[in-house]
Design a protein with these regions (language model features):
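A conditional alpha-helix N-cap/helix-loop micro-motif detector
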Residues: 30, 54-57, 88, 128
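A cross-family acyltransferase "interaction/gating" segment
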Residues: 36-39, 86-163, 167, 182-185, ...
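A membrane-cytosol interface segment of integral membrane proteins
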Residues: 47-68
Length: 195
């Protein structure tokens, strides 16, 4: 079983990842009702979570475990929300319980966006704006490049979810650190496992 764990900058993250690695995503249930994006999400097998119901975590972890054991690639954003792309927020460990339960291999994925000059682009950032405002910001740009950096896999066997949250958060934070030059040519996933 394989799980992708990524930082979360924009609603574009899902569509960027899915073009490289067809995956099932975990998303807040509200997205189901969004125009167009809700329809897209439903049609790619998204697993929806009722975030206001604490007890829904048990159900969603079972759904993720089932998906993983049947061979589906599942992707999660453990920050639970989007950031401005300059920092990685604290990873919540709850959704990583499914990886522990099935001893999944976890691939940390660092996501960032660049503008035409190669600098970090703020246009895709989905923080304190409506979906329409976000789309408008993106459409005003002449060009945006998404960079998906797949780090070395993390074996979940023998680890707990908190340990996995800390480890994957640190890996992604280090990968996105300013010292690392943008446009580094990452290895292309042929959609993963080469263990």
């Amino acid at each position: 079983p394989v799980m992708l764990v990524a930082n979360h900058v924009s609603w574009l993250d899902v569509y960027s990842l899915i073009t490289v690695c067809p995956s099932r995503f975990v998303a807040k249930s509200e997205i189901r009702g969004w125009p167009f994006l809700g329809w897209l999400s439903r049609n790619v097998g998204t697993l929806f979570i009722e975030r206001k119901k604490i007890t829904d975590i048990v159900r969603i972890n079972q759904d993720i475990s089932n998906a993983l054991t049947t061979g589906d690639l599942v992707a999660i954003f453990p920050e639970g929300t989007t950031s401005d792309g300059t920092t990685v927020k604290k990873f919540h460990a709850s959704l990583l319980q499914s990886a522990v339960a099935v001893e999944a291999t976890i691939y940390p994925v660092a996501i960032r966006y660049h503008d035409t000059s190669g600098e970090l682009s703020k246009a895709p950032v989905y923080v304190n704006v409506s979906l329409l405002e976000s789309i408008g910001q993106i459409l005003q740009q002449p060009w945006i490049e998404v960079e998906l950096i797949f780090a070395d896999p993390v074996n979940s066997s023998g680890k707990n979810r908190q340990e996995l949250a800390r480890t994957t958060q640190q890996i992604i934070t280090n990968t996105l650190s300013p010292q690392m030059s943008p446009h580094k040519e990452p290895e292309k996933p042929s959609c993963l496992p080469v263990e």
